[in-house]
Amino acid sequence: MIPIAHIENDFPTKFGIPRQSGRVGALKARIVFEPEYRNVDACRGLEEFSHIWLIWEFSEAKRTKWSPTVRPPRLGGNVRKGVFATRSPFRPNSIGLSCVKLEKVALDEPDSPVLYVEGADLMNGTPIFDIKPYIPYADCHPEATGSFTEYSKDHHLNVEFPQELLERIPGESREALIAVLADDPRPAYQNDPERSYGMPFGEKDIHFRVDGDILRVYNVTEFVKKQQESRADCGK
């Protein structure tokens, strides 16, 4: 498949990305079409839908071999489930599926059409293979059950972010950042209160520790891109 677009957002690495789309609605992103598909007619009528589906590639999680079972982080990393019973990025075909809110379709920008979306769970630069409208009567199933994923859907942390550190974050990004931290960006099996984490967000590196249900930010520094290779991968 050939990418038709890519996403632009504040996640330069995999660490910290919400584990599911829609978990952090305050996250904003741009979807920019590749030149061959940059045609306003291709998006005609899309603005009439409130949400869209993104079909994309786990471009940073490719493997030459696949395993029939994986260990979901939310089960502590020790329990195996069939790969098709999870949303693990390590799949025979590294394809992701996300439902996001469509904020607007911009037609007056140099690289138009540009889609502004909220609640995406993709890394900056992720290639997108297709975009489809979300159809409520067909796509919504209130009676659906979610197996082991139900156990962590309400898990949140209380975030303590000193004002002097918060002021280092651009004003328009603060709400989204706090929501990402509250969603607990750590791998689920890491619970050491003395452990320090560094989460890249935009052009900053957010340093924090977690003790119980409290996440404390203790420093905000400039993000150095070469650090990317050493980041932990939260998975899905």
Place the predicted regions along the sequence by residue.
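Mixed-charge, low-complexity intrinsically disordered regions
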Residues: M1-I95, L107-Y116, A120-K236
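Conserved positions in beta-strands of structured domains
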Residues: E8, V100-E103
